[in-house]
Amino acid sequence: MNIVIEGCDGTGKSTIAKHLCEMLGLQYWHESQPRNLQEYVQMLDYGGFVFDRFCFGQFVYNTPDQRKLTVEELKYLTEKVFPATNTVFLYVDAHTDTIIKRLIERGEGNEKIIPEMTKYIKNIRGTYRSVLRQAGVPYIEINGEGGANYVKQNN
């Protein structure tokens, strides 16, 4: 079994991933990306991971020439490899204001650039939904508004 968690920075992915690892005895894998399709498949075949970002983030945050997979390879992963490796996909989202607050709290922005951050985050959230739709990913959407306390109280 594998669990892939994707979503905009500041939605609570890492918090959820760490709690799932503790609860299910799975290994935590954070953002380090395989170099090609074969490496993605090998990691999923090995199994037992909670991936805090996997292949979808690179389509959202990178330009086409920086991506390590094509759209066709992404579809292959979601249509063939995910089901064969018992991989569950979670998409974590939160309101833009919540994301901005969390990013500022951890030093990844400041109050002077909130209008720019708002535009950027809305774009990222929209791009995630577009990429998931294009790839035909069946996913469970999680509301990341509750934060760490919500995850702890409900596990």
Residue ranges and their predicted role:
Residues P64-E79:
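Substrate-gripping "pore-loop 1 plus following alpha2 helix"
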Residues G10-T11, C55-G57, H95-D97, G146-A148:
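Short, solvent-exposed loop/turn segments at secondary-structure junctions
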Residues N2:
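Walker A (P-loop) ATP-phosphate-binding motif of ABC ATPase nucleotide-binding domains
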Residues I5:
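Hydrophobic anchor at the beta1->P-loop junction of P-loop NTPases
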Residues H19, E108-G109, M117-N155:
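NTP-dependent small-molecule kinase module
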Residues E22, Q66-L69, R106-G109:
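Glycine-rich, phosphate-binding/catalytic loops in enzymes
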Residues C8-T11, T15-Q66:
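Conserved substrate/cofactor phosphate-moiety recognition/catalytic segment
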